Each structure stands twice: as structure tokens, then as C-alpha cells.
């Protein structure tokens, strides 16, 4: 896959930090980078993997959300990075179990951690974007991904976003470039 966001950001010297637990580490690295195993620029990219617990997800639905957030907030407040991404796997992985009580706990765990992330974002006057690539925790009777629309939440941004039916995940990369003051390349469509 060509023209990934990380490739574009590295061209502009943007320092990146990616973190998740083992269950979704590949999603913030390999898949995020267009199925590429190696970094585009070793000096600009930092990857952190929090080891996942080896227990059924419904037995520990909070997973490693707190540990991810500890490192995430540290990275945000450090001032060492211009763009930070994470993946909290709780809604997806616990949602696959089909256990509604466990899924609720998993999602509530992420809610609690996002409150901590917001505190760190506020300290540095940053912008927080929250989205997902699919639904899963939104339909208790299914253990597969749903077709439900996913949110795209912008926190603390002094901007106006377009609204429309033709906008979606394909617009996220250009929007990130815009927030960073970069002109998105012709392959990235802006929200």
C-alpha cells in the first residue's frame, strides 16, 4: 500500500509514537504503515508494545488499557512527539466473546482511560482524534464486526469540519496533515 500517513509524515520530519498492547500492536504499526514491517524512518518513529495478558478476554475485559494510557500520557506530556496513535482493543476483542457484561466493562475501561488522555492533551494544548475502523461492541448478539458507522470525534480543535455522507475513514489521514499544518498530498482527501 502506497501513500500511507506515516510515510507522508516522515517526509515532513514529523516525530511519531505508536502504542498498543500485543493484541493490536500490529494495527498501529504494520497495518497502519500499509502492511510494511519496517519503519519509514527509524529516527522519527517510536513503537511501544505492552504485552497482553494470556487469559480469555471476558475474564479480564479491561485488558491493558491502564498500562497503555500510562505510557500514552507520558508520551503526550513529554513534548517529544508531534503525532501519537494508539489502539485500545477492548471493544473489539472483548466484543468478539459475545459477553455483554464483559463488553460493557471493556468499553467503560476505555472511557475511564480516555478521561486521563484528555487531561494530558489539555496540558499540552493538543488535539485528540478518536475513531474506529469498525463496530463490534455495539451488537451483543454478534461476535463478528458490525457495519455500524463509527464516530470521528475531534477534541480541542479550533476548526470546522465538513459534514457529509461521502466522508469516512479515507479522510482521516488528510485531516491529520491539516491539523499538523501540512498540505496533504493528492492521494489524501480532507475532511
What residue ranges belong to the model's regions?
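Feature captures the catalytic ectodomains and active-site-proximal regions of enzymes
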Residues: 1-191
Amino acid at each position: 500500500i502506497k501513500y500511507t500517513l506515516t510515510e507522508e509524515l516522515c517526509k515532513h520530519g514529523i516525530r511519531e509514537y505508536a502504542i498498543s498492547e500485543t493484541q493490536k500492536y500490529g494495527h498501529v504499526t504494520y497495518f497502519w504503515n500499509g502492511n510494511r514491517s519496517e519503519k519509514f524512518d527509524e529516527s522519527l518513529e517510536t513503537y511501544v508494545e505492552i504485552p497482553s495478558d494470556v487469559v480469555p478476554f471476558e475474564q479480564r475485559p479491561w485488558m491493558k488499557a491502564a498500562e497503555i494510557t500510562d505510557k500514552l500520557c507520558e508520551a503526550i506530556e513529554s513534548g517529544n512527539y508531534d503525532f501519537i496513535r494508539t489502539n485500545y482493543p477492548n471493544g473489539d476483542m472483548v466484543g468478539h466473546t459475545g459477553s455483554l457484561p464483559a463488553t460493557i466493562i471493556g468499553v467503560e475501561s476505555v472511557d475511564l482511560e480516555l478521561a486521563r488522555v484528555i487531561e494530558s492533551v489539555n496540558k499540552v494544548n493538543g488535539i485528540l482524534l478518536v475513531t474506529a475502523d469498525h463496530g463490534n461492541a455495539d451488537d451483543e448478539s454478534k461476535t463478528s464486526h458490525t457495519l455500524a458507522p463509527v464516530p470521528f470525534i475531534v477534541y480541542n480543535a479550533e476548526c470546522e469540519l465538513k459534514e457529509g455522507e461521502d466522508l469516512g475513514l479515507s479522510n482521516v489521514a488528510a485531516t491529520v496533515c491539516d491539523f499538523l499544518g501540512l498540505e496533504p498530498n493528492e492521494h489524501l482527501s480532507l475532511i
